[in-house]
């Protein structure tokens, strides 16, 4: 659609360029912007245009346009608002969704912008009405009715007993007290939501200074607050049953009418099945669904055609006196899920949403046509950051393999070695802010049998139930594991075949060859991951077609071992392959192969050369989260989206689903029935199959089941979270009533969940340091922890409440920035930071690290040091004092003999930096062992250094 700037109203220029709301009021048939201080204040005699701009994860902006029509506005004014929304959409590039909002019948999405409610005022611009500030006039007693259990519709009703009924919630706003009257047939959720309106009235009309009372329908005068409430109505009297309201707008939900707007007229289209192919890109259409009227506008239609189609929709509703029908206008390629769902089938087409890269390219093309230099503008976008795990990885891990309807505990040495034909259960315990947290998961191999999968889910669910539902439960499929899984296991391998009796029986009965991995056989492994704390080796078919230029590989046949590095790999990938080689073939010499210079023997083992891909294997990206409330009438899942959600939307009586595309979270409230709790994983499975957002969800998408009060950080990060709220007692209504009456948030002894700051991972973590804190006894749980050196150092750099999250502890390259290095002439023999470090080893256990005992100077030095931390650093340097009578190396470190520094030493040295064992060798012994000086060694690539250290048992 080509649009001339002369067709656009000047008021819309520059609109939608930043996230947030923008509102215009129609005055004399022109859009006039209103100040942000007046957002949410609507007058019944006016029409408004509301633009909501949302920044998406992909860097683009999404626009939703609403035009709100007051009940007293003129038809001409409402028609102007409808046409101007089309014009505003054109100014934004023609991809916004447009909604018609009628006073009293607004959409949930619209009301979510103005939480907790909107309360339209009488009057408007055309009537010359002047709004009088609340505090400038005598308070008038008013009665409001509230409906809705997710968003609240508020309507003022006559202040009379006849307005009350048993089905709704009523708010009586008097000069000194606000009463909430709860109809006996109203739900807990409706009562809780109405309390948000009470709080709003208290803050807005009473400056937060008035009493609040709750009155239950049916309570007599014996209740003091009930008696006071009924006194305003002349005394208590039973309420009559509300007569059913005759709704003149009844629709046949199963019959949709499709109308084509052609040359100014609406022409009905006859069809047997409502198919996408009926819509032509050069036409506008109306799809009349009764309660909703969609206007679909083809990409090649003109602005005038779109305006005319919009006018036709308004006239259609006006002629039929359909005041409650919602009008939704969509552009081809940007249809809503609700519109697509009306069709029998909707083709899977790539999203036309404009990403930041697309936008940069279009702008560059425009500037280039104008003769400007666009070289800098067209630089490649920065590489995507590795996703964060948002989980503490210093916990303890146990793993079981499913075998014959039972689970077998794996020894620590085998906990990270899975087989694609088997199923596993894992339990991970890790420190939380106020308690130990637990994650229980089941993992299904691609070739595992259904019986083992059912057993795994059943046994894992029993473990969660025995933990009183306080553990998070997850269901994972091979190849679709989330980042949390990988950082928990750190080093993870998947082998071909399986060990379970069920798998062995299945392949025998079906005549399938047993290709279970053999250490001395032929095997090819794809190596992947982001570093030593997140690396995987996946066995693939031993064929050249399994190679990929973006990965490194390990190929072995007996004692013959090759490593292969693709041309698109990084030095970090090469680091990871060396570490995995130490696990898969720890005592074998390997031959390195670079892509393009392979030996004949290498190709021979793979059965000869063949074509192979070069792009990395794609994983589902995390998208903008969507929250849904869930009910299960007669086993059928019914869901409803909650827009612009907050923590307060999670009600303790209900089940909610948070859909992030890459992961599905099922949140279960404390007040939910136990039978429904046990169905939580099934609810998640049904949601994935339903694919409500039509985002082509994979059936293997990870599902997490989370109980209220046990929310992990990787869930709470989607909210502004206050853990005290989820630890309150009572139902949703009782909790909110205590907050409203108390005038603030609940005061509990439990600490609030800290919102952590996540830094990047260290690229190097010494294997021996990690293994030192692991138990290799089958009876014991595998436990990871910080090294003593790091724990002591971290005591000076971290607050008492901080903890390690998602990665092993960050490491420090230098204690001072270059510009702040202490002068050598004035530097003490022991730096303040080091003095604090060594002092922390001697502190009694009753004194916490980071306490008041630290000197102000030490705190300043620590702050200086922490500023030099980076997310990608390679070594931890701790300069401790040279002990008496010990030789000192050139670097100021004590010198120890080689036999005491190796990882298998009978009498190992303690209190050294285990990531740099080689630095404690004397210069002479270092040259003897490594065949080069320390300086020459320091210039080698890191992966090569590590390879040499492994060979000398110093790694």
UniProtKB/Swiss-Prot annotation:
GO-annotated molecular function: actin filament binding
Any one of the GO BP annotations: actin filament severing
A Pfam family hit: Gelsolin
CDD domains referenced in this protein's UniProt entry, alphabetically: gelsolin_S1_like (cd11290), gelsolin_S2_like (cd11289), gelsolin_S3_like (cd11292), gelsolin_S4_like (cd11293), gelsolin_S5_like (cd11288), gelsolin_S6_like (cd11291)
Low complexity composition-biased segments: 817-836
Compartments, as annotated in UniProt: Cytoplasm, Cytoskeleton
UniProt keyword annotation of Heme present: no
InterPro entries: ADF-H/Gelsolin-like_dom_sf (IPR029006), Gelsolin-like_dom (IPR007123), Gelsolin-like_dom_sf (IPR036180), Villin/Gelsolin (IPR007122), Villin_headpiece (IPR003128), Villin_headpiece_dom_sf (IPR036886)
Top-level taxon of the source organism: Eukaryota
Signal peptide start-end: none
Gelsolin-like repeat ranges, renumbered to this chain: 29-111, 152-218, 274-339, 644-712
Cellular component GO terms, alphabetical: actin filament bundle; cytoplasm
Compositionally biased residues, Basic and acidic residues: 842-864
Disordered: annotated span: 741-783, 801-895
HP domain segment(s): 890-955
Protein family: Belongs to the villin/gelsolin family.
Job description of the protein: Ca(2+)-regulated actin-binding protein. Binds actin microfilaments (MFs). Involved in actin filament bundling, severing and capping. Caps the barbed end of actin filaments and is able to sever them in a calcium-dependent manner.
Protein's name in the database: Villin-5
Organism: Oryza sativa subsp. japonica
